[in-house]
Regions:
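Carbohydrate transferase catalytic cores enriched for Leloir-type hexosyltransferases
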Residues: 1-367
Length: 367
């Protein structure tokens, strides 16, 4: 039997979705060398199909990498990939794929385009809503959390029991070596700053964190904002005239790891998530997490975070004050974090995916 993996993610800007796809592929590659994996899967022909403009590369042992076609973007998905993957089972891990492939499983990470249309422009909504509905009709849908399974089942008119869950993980970040020089370069004091890491997109809800900083009124304990173009962070002028904000811009993983390790707390005010990886990254480095009550975030963090309503800046301010009063993370808090981080594993998610694929592989090998 042939298994084809949609490698379009290797031609896209690296975000959480592309990271997920890359880590799952690498974990599958490792599992295919294990005797614990069914022979029907180990002996199958595995190929990662990529566009010619793929800029990222993976080092794989069991999965062949093959560039196909000449097109780019969605056109590559719908034409070049569909043609190259004909006759095999196709696995798409990054929200999109050929809508008319006859044997296709696609991981859709969340239902934002249906639940929060205010986050997107009309062109993006039109494309991704249409694609989601067509994929739900012609492919098998999987996702990354129980919350996203419930949401996708409702908006795509599917049975939740028919949507398997292959969760995210933050294991990859544990391999990151912190670069402590960033602390001095930013001019902050250990355990005397709060940290926000994320894009400027509406769902990340940076404005509520900025409002909480205004209410906190502690210029000596800044909010360090990592990610995105500084010139665009405050495009709605939400940060104008606010003291206690420090714009760090884009940083390396090592620099971010060092900030996690030295922050008073990591602030995660998201309005909507399909999973929520950054809090787990913070927990790896022993950083207390103050997170919104968005359903997927609570599912991910469980009892290892302090929570506030994403629309309530006063509640966030109070948690920030409490964290400053508590000081360093306690041993009990650290144990909860470690348990939560260990709960999610790329290998466990990849094994769940392979277990899902095994019945069809067994049938094919017996034919």
């Amino acid at each position: 039997m042939k298994f084809f993996i949609n490698g379009r993610f290797l031609s896209q800007k690296l975000t959480g979705v592309q990271r997920y796809a890359a880590e799952i592929v690498k974990a599958i590659d490792v599992l295919l060398a294990s005797e614990q994996t069914p022979a029907s899967l180990r002996n199958a022909d595995w190929q990662l199909l990529t566009p010619v403009d793929a800029s990222e590369q993976l080092q794989l042992e069991r999965i062949k990498i093959r560039a196909v076609g000449r097109l780019r973007g969605h056109a590559w998905d719908q034409i070049d990939l569909a043609r190259a993957a004909a006759g095999g089972r196709l696995i798409s891990l990054a929200n999109s794929g050929p809508v008319f492939h006859r044997d296709h499983i696609v991981v859709i990470h969340d239902a934002q385009v249906f639940r929060r249309p205010d986050f997107f422009n009309w062109r993006y909504l039109a494309v991704h809503r249409t694609m989601g509905r067509l994929l739900a009709r012609h492919a098998s849908i999987a996702t990354v959390s129980a919350f996203s399974r419930k949401e996708l089942a409702e908006v795509l008119n599917l049975s939740a029991t028919a949507i398997p869950v292959f969760p995210n993980s933050a294991e990859h970040f544990a391999r990151t070596k912190p670069d402590p020089d960033i602390i001095a370069r930013l001019g902050v004091q250990p355990q005397k700053f709060f940290l926000f890491v994320g894009s400027k997109t509406k769902n990340k809800n940076l404005s509520i964190a900025i409002r909480a900083v205004q209410l906190l009124d502690r210029a000596d304990v800044p909010l360090v904002i990592v990610g995105g173009d500084n010139s665009k962070v405050f495009q709605d002028n939400s940060g104008d005239g606010v003291s206690g904000l420090l714009l760090a811009g884009r940083l390396t993983d090592g620099e971010i790891a060092a900030l996690y390790a030295h922050a008073s707390a990591f602030v995660f005010p998201s309005l909507y998530e399909g999973f929520g990886v950054p809090p787990l990254e913070a927990m790896i480095f022993g950083c207390p997490v103050i997170a919104s009550t968005a359903d997927a975030v609570v599912e991910t963090c469980a009892d290892a975070a302090a929570y506030f309503d994403a629309n309530d800046a006063e509640s966030l301010k109070q948690l920030m004050l409490e964290r400053l009063a508590i000081g360093a993370i306690s041993d009990q808090e650290r144990r909860r974090q470690q348990e939560r981080v260990a709960f999610f594993s790329w290998q466990k998610s990849a094994k769940s995916l392979l277990d899902h694929l095994a019945p069809s592989a067994n049938i094919a090998s017996a034919a």
